Amino acid sequence: MTDRTQPHAVQVHTTAGRFGDTAAGTNRYADRGPSTSKVIAVITGLPIGGTLLLFAGLALAGTLLGLAVTTPLFILFSPVIVPATIVVGLSVAGFLTSGACGLTGLSSFSWVMNYIRQTHGSVPEQLEMAKHRMADVAGYVGQKTKDVGQ
């Protein structure tokens, strides 16, 4: 048996930077325009987000208008407890609806912006990068197997 107490050196070989950077430090994808999927995401995401923000604004305006109209009527023409319960319930429902639509719209905008700013390449580029990494790992494992066998 061989003595295994000696330390072994590990060699790491890299082929390219993580986010498409080349050895010169420039992005090789910078000269390209937005991909088709990004354009489609913007075209579909912005109207959806804008529509949801519009619904949030309409729900808020409707809630405030309803409160402005119904509060004096309830105070003048009916007992106190039932209308107060209805007013509070409707106002809470309106504000929650407005907030939910607003958060949904802002989340849509945030998702679109994150998708646009995404620095990863397209699927074929990611597959090519994965192939290179697998080839590097296979070469490393082969070299280590030869080293251990000697």
Curated annotation (Swiss-Prot):
Location in or out of the cell: Lipid droplet; Membrane
Keyword Mitochondrion: no
An individual GO BP term: response to freezing
One GO CC annotation: membrane
Entry function: May have a structural role to stabilize the lipid body during desiccation of the seed by preventing coalescence of the oil. Probably interacts with both lipid and phospholipid moieties of lipid bodies. May also provide recognition signals for specific lipase anchorage in lipolysis during seedling growth.
Name of protein: Oleosin Ara h 10.0102
Lineage of origin: Eukaryota, Viridiplantae, Streptophyta, Embryophyta, Tracheophyta
Annotated organism of origin: Arachis hypogaea
Membrane topology: Multi-pass membrane protein
